Amino acid sequence: MSIGRNTAIAGVTLAAGALLLTACSPDESDNASPGADGKKVELRVATFPPGADKAAYDAFAVQEKQFEDLNPDIDVIGVEYEWTGPTFAVQLAGGSLPDVFTVPFTDSKTLLENGQLMDVTEEMKALGYTDKFNPVILDGVTGSDGKIYGFPRQAYAMGLHYNRDLFEAAGLDPNKPPTTWDEIRKDAKIIAEKTGKAGYAQMAINNTGGWQLTAETVARGGRTQEQNADGTFKSTINNPATVAALQFLHDVRWTDNAFGSKYDLDWGTINQEFAAGNIGMYTSGSDVYTALVRDFGMNPDQYGMTVVPNEGENAGTLGGGDIAVVSPTVDSTTKAAAVKWIDWYYMQKLMNEDAAVADAKALSDAGQAVGTPVLPVLSKDLYEQSLTWIEPYINVPRDQMTPFTDNIWDQTPVGEPKGQTQAIYGLLDPVVQSVLTDKNADINALLTKADTDAQALLDK
């Protein structure tokens, strides 16, 4: 699930959107290229979530000018944007959706099924890098018709984020973060006792509770669903790994009193609490550092990241990401401009040295994060080469992230569940909340019901 991870965790209720497309579909007879009629094409592009600092927009202004200098027939208009699945259909119908925006991998399948993404197959082929993508990642933007509906732009793996100051205040070594779930629990208890802060916290609402419970199930070797040979799915929520993940939460909360007092956190609020120094550790995507500093004001010196402990047979690390897409309502002139922007703004910096350096310089000059750990959507070799290109501009404290960057390649990446992803995440939210708010919650009973409800969704 990611970008600002707000984009990667919101629930999806898009059924109405499919009905709206007929009324707002573009006129495909208009095959003009950008500016072909002598007029500038106005292109509305997504920028940042509400709350982004001025420096982020300063950097964007530099990049906007660079693009417009290269494409004088296109007028880029930045639009404040935050992905929220439940409002997507309304934005689509009301015309408030940017022409270019990003959506998480987990939601792209739903949008594809509803016909709510623009086909960019030929455009990607013309750009010449369709075959450069990791095939597993490209599959996430490929419809059942074999066509491509977006540009994978970044991916992440789950990480354990920790506050170095709280570690030091508790007498723990921030350069030696926990490597097992038992050690996480032990350190969380020490942090809570020594500092009065939450030693460990976890998301629990707006589908993020299910997202993180799934991640911690995978880390213990379990899976919440299986795909059958005929393409159908079987729910496997009630498994030993999920039971263990919930028992861990119960013990941190009720036995150790190390969870703090907030049991209704989501991606935004847990980041806010962590950035404010109120949480010792939590799990989230490895790319969250940028948002923590840019949107939530975290002091970089306080930040640390390590891998999520993998324990048991078939253990892995949940990953996700997001894609850049074109609104299905635009005409072909705007579509052509949109693809130019996506190629320039999102893609070229992943594979072209000059573009990577220009992007890194613009961000660095504006005080924005450069070098936040991500997973490559292309090849690992190309990703590592790109880090050498931008090395002079890297300003994130990567030495404080080496427990993650040194070990993530040894873990097995696992994609998010494909069947009814967000809906089932939503089903699991109350399970997490129950364990955190009811000392006597019956974990097996909760998971049995969730399994039944999830299977009903998968059978639709």
What are these regions (language model features)?
Residues 2-110, 125-129, 174, 333, ...:
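Conserved N-terminal structural module of periplasmic/extracytoplasmic solute-binding proteins
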Residues 59-62, 244-248, 332-345, 446:
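Short amphipathic alpha-helical coupling segments at ligand-binding clamshell hinges
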Residues 121-133, 177-179, 200-202, 222-244, ...:
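Short, solvent-exposed loop/beta-turn-alpha elements that line the ligand-binding surface or hinge
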Residues 292-298, 313-318, 326-426:
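C-terminal lobe and pocket-closing loops
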